[in-house]
C-alpha cells in the first residue's frame, strides 16, 4: 500500500503539526538531530513554552553560542523554528516547537 502525496517521495514534510520523515537519508538526519542530550533538554523545555537563547542557556547550563548551534541543528530538520523579537536590550531570538509529533515512515514510499 503506497503513501499519498505529499508522502510519495523521500523527504521531510510537515502536515497538521506532525513531522513526517521518509527515506533512510532523512531518517538519519532527524535521528541525528534528536540524538543529543542538550538538544533533548531544549526540546523538553520549549515544549512547555517558547524561550530565548538567554533562558535556554541558563536552563541547560551552556553558553549562548553552543545553544545557538544546537538550535540551528534542530531548525535544519524543521523540528523547531526561531523568530526575532524586540527585547529590553536589542533583539532576542525566541525558539519554539514547529511540530508536536515526529513520524518516521520506514516503508519504501514507492512500494504500492
Feature roles, as predicted:
Residues 11-31:
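Short, Lys/Arg-enriched N-terminal segment that forms or immediately precedes the first helix
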Residues 40-44:
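Pre-recognition alpha-helix immediately N-terminal to the DNA-recognition helix
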Residues 58, 75-76:
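Alpha-helical residues within the helix-turn-helix
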Residues 87-112:
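Conserved segment of winged-helix/HTH DNA-binding domains
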Residues 78, 84:
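Glycine-centered, phosphate/nucleic-acid-interacting loop/turn motifs that mediate DNA/RNA or nucleotide
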Residues 48-54:
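Short capping segments at the starts of secondary-structure elements
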Residues 32-38:
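Short helix-coil-helix linker/hinge
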Amino acid at each position: 500500500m503506497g503513501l499519498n502525496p505529499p508522502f510519495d517521495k523521500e523527504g521531510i514534510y510537515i502536515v497538521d503539526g506532525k513531522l513526517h520523515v521518509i527515506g533512510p537519508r532523512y531518517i538519519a538526519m532527524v535521528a541525528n538531530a534528536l540524538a543529543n542530550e542538550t538538544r533533548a533538554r531544549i526540546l523538553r523545555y520549549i515544549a512547555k513554552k517558547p524561550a530565548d537563547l538567554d533562558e535556554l542557556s541558563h536552563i541547560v547550563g551552556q553558553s549562548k553560542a553552543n545553544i545557538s548551534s544546537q538550535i540551528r541543528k534542530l531548525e535544519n530538520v524543521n523540528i523547531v523554528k526561531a523568530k526575532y523579537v524586540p527585547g529590553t536590550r536589542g533583539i532576542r531570538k525566541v525558539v519554539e516547537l514547529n511540530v508536536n509529533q515526529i513520524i518516521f515512515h520506514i516503508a519504501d514510499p514507492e512500494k504500492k
